[in-house]
């Protein structure tokens, strides 16, 4: 048996950046970050939430600073934390108001700014065209407005995060580069150049998006551009507006897990809608399941290559209806399941309504069964609705045997199963077979000892990393819980932008700017709209500071505009404003009807 040369990962080398009493960078552990949801002016409530976050394992906490009232509140918050001997670093989140950053840096450990709105106007999609002269003048204006903050941070020894968000790029950058990954990268680099010119290096970067595919590509591109310039600045990872529940965990794990597996990332946050308390255990599980493996794998020559299907192999779907140009999901059924399950219950678990024969949108394309069970009555019943494959009809490749991967017997099979034990071995497999057009079914099983959240994170990180690069032809999931298999399989396919079978929801985690009960409203909107067809994306955003921009690719948006009032959006355009919140959900339904996407629940 050949010993595989696994495509390993190791931490990208980054500078140490001091934030209060702790350091961030590749020579230090990856830190967990969160953000308070209390009003920053509620000093007591904010301090209580910060203390609760620290007790759970949060390393860095951020608060929103809209203006001078919040600046003064930060002074009191920091004093209270010092009095209670709480050393967790405090970060101020700044949008649209540079003077707040200049003042608050005196009392916090780090400031976060958004290049899309710190100096320039946020893009309002007016179609304005910048000449080269106007663009150069705008860069000079950026230098003049941004340099005072850089100078003060440098003088006081305070850190800064330059946090780019997809969808909230400045008008100038969007006009030149579009709302693209390139635009995100150049937005960050413009601010980085000011910092470098002023010899200020306590800088961290982030490139967030609610779309994991965009987010991963943006971080990879920025890391490449920074390292080309020998600027070894740390990265903070996050999928912004990931949403709530299992879907939010899946999105975060697909995006963050992929990058951690490539050695990128020095701090992380899982931006889940609801209490920030719920984010910390997910972050801990995510780090546990990715970094421990990476440490064992060791160092590689090409630690964070910008992977693509073109580099690592092509994706060919199995040419069997209904899989033409569709990435299929298969469920493995064991002989024990087939022999012991009640037929009606098993069909329902697969998403088949035994009364009407209707198929749920999250029903898999097919099942894989032992050949000996193919003629059983239950399999015959399943075959009326789904494709059925005999497990023995295609080779199941050993992930540790490279000779088997390339053998004549393997390559002559109609398709193969490849058992994915880790991301880097799978990438090695596709790299060696990059000229093969043979369909590959990625096979996944789960450790039965994992908790539900650990299982969600493990599968999302392993499968998501490969799907984002367009690898494989279909997925075979081998779990005891068939319903969980279906749910996770399609959520991961949706997070990787490969298939969309249900409505996708984008919702921010909430912060001190949030103007309504974000979790409750998000859940109600989900209940009202979850029956609508896949491909639709609905955003629920707590305020207008980032809401309109950061729901970049949503079809419809529900955004808090002022206390008790909601604005409704179609794409980037506000079409209904200042709707009383008690009427807003019904108005959203009416808007969906006006645009022809509404249908009544069955």
Curated annotation (Swiss-Prot):
Keywords: 4Fe-4S, Iron, Iron-sulfur, Isoprene biosynthesis, Metal-binding, Oxidoreductase. It catalyses: (2E)-4-hydroxy-3-methylbut-2-enyl diphosphate + oxidized [flavodoxin] + H2O + 2 H(+) = 2-C-methyl-D-erythritol 2,4-cyclic diphosphate + reduced [flavodoxin]. Pathway: Isoprenoid biosynthesis; isopentenyl diphosphate biosynthesis via DXP pathway; isopentenyl diphosphate from 1-deoxy-D-xylulose 5-phosphate: step 5/6. It is an enzyme of class 1 (oxidoreductase). Its EC number is 1.17.7.3. [4Fe-4S] cluster binds at residues 508, 511, 543, 550. Gene3D superfamilies: Dihydropteroate synthase-like (3.20.20.20), Sulfite Reductase Hemoprotein, domain 1 (3.30.413.10). Belongs to the IspG family. This is 4-hydroxy-3-methylbut-2-en-1-yl diphosphate synthase (flavodoxin). It comes from Chlamydia trachomatis serovar L2 (strain ATCC VR-902B / DSM 19102 / 434/Bu). The lineage of its organism: Bacteria, Pseudomonadati, Chlamydiota, Chlamydiia, Chlamydiales.
């Amino acid at each position: 048996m050949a010993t595989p040369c696994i495509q390993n990962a190791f931490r990208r080398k980054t500078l140490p950046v001091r934030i209060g009493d702790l350091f961030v960078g590749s020579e230090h552990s990856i830190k967990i970050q969160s953000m308070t949801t209390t009003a920053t002016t509620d000093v007591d409530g904010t301090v209580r939430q910060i203390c609760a976050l620290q007790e759970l394992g949060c390393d860095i906490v951020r608060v929103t600073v809209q203006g001078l009232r919040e600046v003064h509140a930060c002074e009191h918050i920091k004093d209270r934390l010092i009095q209670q001997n709480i050393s967790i670093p405090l970060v101020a989140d700044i949008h649209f108001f540079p003077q707040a950053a200049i003042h608050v840096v005196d009392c916090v450990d780090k400031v976060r700014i958004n290049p899309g709105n710190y100096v320039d106007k946020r893009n309002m999609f007016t179609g304005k065209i910048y000449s080269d002269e106007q663009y150069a003048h705008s860069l000079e204006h950026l230098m003049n407005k941004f340099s005072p903050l850089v100078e003060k941070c440098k003088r006081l020894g305070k850190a800064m995060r330059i946090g780019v968000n997809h969808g909230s790029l400045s008008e100038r950058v969007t006009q030149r580069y579009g709302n693209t990954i390139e635009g995100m990268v150049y937005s960050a680099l413009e601010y980085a150049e000011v910092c470098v010119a002023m010899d200020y290096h306590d800088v961290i970067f982030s490139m967030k998006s609610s779309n994991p595919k965009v987010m991963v590509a943006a971080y990879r591109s920025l890391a490449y551009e920074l390292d080309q310039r020998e600027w070894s600045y740390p990265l903070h990872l996050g999928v912004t507006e990931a949403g709530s529940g299992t879907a939010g965990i899946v999105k975060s794990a697909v995006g963050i897990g992929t990058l951690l597996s490539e050695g990128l990332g020095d701090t992380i946050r899982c931006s889940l809608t609801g209490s920030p308390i719920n984010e910390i255990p997910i972050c801990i599980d995510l780090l546990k399941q990715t970094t421990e493996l990476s440490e064992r794998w060791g160092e590689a020559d090409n630690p964070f290559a910008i992977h693509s299907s073109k580099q690592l192999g092509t994706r060919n779907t199995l040419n069997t209806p209904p899989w033409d140009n569709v990435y299929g999901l298969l469920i493995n059924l064991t002989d024990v399941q087939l022999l012991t399950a009640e037929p009606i219950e098993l069909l329902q678990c697969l998403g088949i309504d035994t009364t009407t024969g209707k198929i749920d949108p999250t029903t898999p394309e097919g099942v894989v069964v032992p050949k000996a069970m193919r003629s059983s009555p239950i399999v015959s019943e399943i075959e009326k609705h789904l494709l059925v494959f005999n497990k023995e009809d295609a080779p199941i490749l050993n992930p540790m045997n490279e000779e088997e991967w390339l053998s004549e017997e393997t390559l002559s099979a109609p398709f193969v199963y490849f058992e994915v034990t880790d991301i880097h071995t799978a990438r090695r497999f596709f790299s060696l077979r990059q000229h093969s057009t043979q369909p590959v079914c990625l096979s996944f099983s789960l450790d039965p000892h994992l908790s539900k959240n650990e299982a969600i994170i493990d599968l999302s990180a392993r499968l998501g990393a490969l799907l984002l690069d367009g690898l494989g032809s279909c997925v075979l999931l081998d779990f005891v819980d068939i319903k969980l298999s279906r749910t996770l399989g399609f959520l991961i396919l949706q997070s990787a932008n490969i298939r969309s079978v249900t409505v996708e929801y984008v919702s921010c985690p909430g912060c001190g700017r949030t103007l309504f009960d974000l979790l409750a409203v998000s859940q109600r909107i989900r209940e009202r709209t979850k029956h609508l067809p896949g491909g639709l994306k609905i955003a629920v955003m707590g305020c207008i500071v980032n809401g309109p921009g950061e729901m970049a690719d949503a079809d419809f948006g529900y955004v808090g505009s002022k206390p008790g009032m909601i604005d409704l959006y179609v794409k980037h355009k506000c079409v209904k404003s200042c709707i009383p919140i008690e009427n807003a959900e019904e108005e959203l339904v009416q808007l969906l009807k006006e645009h022809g996407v509404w249908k009544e629940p069955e």
